Amino acid sequence: MNETLFTGISQLVTPAPGVQRGAAMRELTRLDDAAMLVRDGVIAWTGSRQQAPASTSIHDLGGVAVVPGLVDPHTHSVWAGDRLADFEARISGVPYEEILARGGGIRSTMRATAASSVEALVALARPRLEALRDSGATTVEVKSGYGLDFAAERRMLQAVQILQAEFQLIPTLLIHVPPQDHRAAYVQGVCEDLIPWVAAEHLATAVDVFCEKEAFSVEETRQILAAAQQHGLQVKVHADQFQAIGGTELACQLGALSVDHLEASGQAQIEALAASDTVATILPGVTLHLGLPAAPGRRLIDAGAAVAVGTDLNPGSSPVFSSQLVLALAVRLCGLTPPEALSACTVNAAHALGLRDRGALAPGQRADFLALHSSDWRDLAYTLGASPVRDVWQAGTRV
């Protein structure tokens, strides 16, 4: 048995275990002058330092605040190529349609990714995942979705599988961009070939579909997600990024883990999420990078929804390599309070991935936690441009 008593905790701050909805997202537990006992990578006890159980191994954290490790529920961390020319063109006023016509946009990323080996994709993704972890993300979801064909999608997921030896990763098969021709045959192939293969090889725990006018229709999304559920996979949906066409309502009907983006969500979508068990995942890095309207985080919480926050790390719309930064942006751009943002980036983000064993500092939870530079946990939401995270601990081990 491996046991350590962590002391020197000015504030131990945590939401309760499990998904938090509405006003409950603001209800954090704060223990001052605290201690935490970790046994075999799992939290065994938390409380006042003066009441701490005896232990032969004591680690003094030095009088700083401790919070749960962050969970990033939405990334596209595996890609090849770059979008630097697109970025310069866009900020110079070039329309996206013209960028696509020049050979840029998402299809340039798809071409570069499809041309890359598994080994090359691993090497490209590793420093991105290291940056996320350094920012406080102890668990990270990674999607496929940049493959020009099914073989490229498989290589992306195989790269994630290799990287799972180094990081806590949750792999998702993303059905992202419809082909320019033969859509019906493509959707049929996804349902009858790609999803069964991914499920049989255990390369993903969930299937996500981009449901938008420019992507997959509601009916196509329904067909794909039904196939995923038939093969024992969880389901998620990208919806309401540009227009609300019914993807959110479909996700709630199907019991999806989460609906992600939601920048264009209106009252009907907010009410559907509030009445469901589906997590509303908002992505403020997209708002920052593209200058688009923010998702209605404040309205979602006030309606009683469970809100999570992710980076949406990707080369086109959110080149954001910090989970702490998007926590801070959720406060500034989406109207969350700091306690709500902490809940959104921990227990609710874990719930959006189907995880129940992490996100809170409580007995029985994985000992994933952050020691900050500050003695006040609110620096996590306050600081911009530098990391307030001093140490990252996964299963009781500093990484």
Curated annotation (Swiss-Prot):
SUPFAM superfamilies: Composite domain of metallo-dependent hydrolases (SSF51338), Metallo-dependent hydrolases (SSF51556)
EC category: hydrolase
Keyword set, alphabetical order: Cytoplasm, Histidine metabolism, Hydrolase, Iron, Metal-binding, Zinc
Gene this chain is encoded by: hutI
Residues involved in N-formimidoyl-L-glutamate binding: Y146, N314, G316
Gene source species: Deinococcus deserti (strain DSM 17065 / CIP 109153 / LMG 22923 / VCD115)
Cofactor detail note: Binds 1 zinc or iron ion per subunit.
Compartments (UniProt record): Cytoplasm
PANTHER family from the UniProt entry: IMIDAZOLONEPROPIONASE, IMIDAZOLONEPROPIONASE-RELATED
Residues that coordinate or bind Fe(3+): H74, H76, H238, D312
Protein name: Imidazolonepropionase
Cellular component, GO annotation: cytoplasm
Reactions performed catalytically: 4-imidazolone-5-propanoate + H2O = N-formimidoyl-L-glutamate
EC numbers: 3.5.2.7
Functional note: Catalyzes the hydrolytic cleavage of the carbon-nitrogen bond in imidazolone-5-propanoate to yield N-formimidoyl-L-glutamate. It is the third step in the universal histidine degradation pathway.
